[in-house]
Amino acid sequence: AEYGAPVTAHEVFKPVTVTTAPDGETIYDFGQNFAGVIRISLQGSAGQVITVRHAEILNPDGTLNTTFLRSAKATATYTCRDGKQTYSPRFTYMGFRYAGIKGVKPEDVEVEAVALYSDVAHAGAFHCSNELLNRLQSNITWSAKSNFVDIPTDCPQRDERMGWTGDINVFAPTALYNFELSRFLEKWLRDVKAEQRPGGGIPNTVPVQGYGCLLYTSPSP
């Protein structure tokens, strides 16, 4: 079996608000930015097509703002069969707070979202009388969860989700106050070893060798 912390389903979010955008798309706000997938349940008709788009922020007019996704589509399309059914994307995940759905009326579908991240246990917690600091701690924790999906990434929403070595090098000391990361990081360091170049150089992303330049090259003997 593969060594490491498996990616599993965690928090389940219900929409905190449901609105209709000017173009008719139904916008669901889950109240938290996270990495995961949508889950819809409905009484569908054969051939009915439902499209779900994802975004972290909204435009002033209430539509999804996908500017920062670059070329990522962050879109799931589902074709229904007759009868009651539940759909959730497989073999992928998105970084989002908002989901826009077309192809089904909001009163005809149950919508929720599931956070996905590596199964790392909490190692510590922080709470104080200052709500701004509490929010900062919450943001730090959720940023870690969203970027601990099998490898340490720098963002969960864009058109690349690489294991940037510099980012985790900076963040690991902080993350270890919040999470037990031994299996997660040991597995990734095995990936780093596997990607190390003959001259000692380490790519700036692991485990995608050759993406970008070298981060570090050891001196020649």
What does each of the following model-derived ranges do?
Residues W164-V170, T174-Y177, L214-L215:
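An alpha-helical repeat/solenoid feature that recognizes helix-turn-helix modules
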Residues P173-L176, R190, A194:
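Generic alpha-helical structural context detector
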Residues Y216-P221:
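Conserved small/polar residues in nucleotide/adenosyl-binding loops
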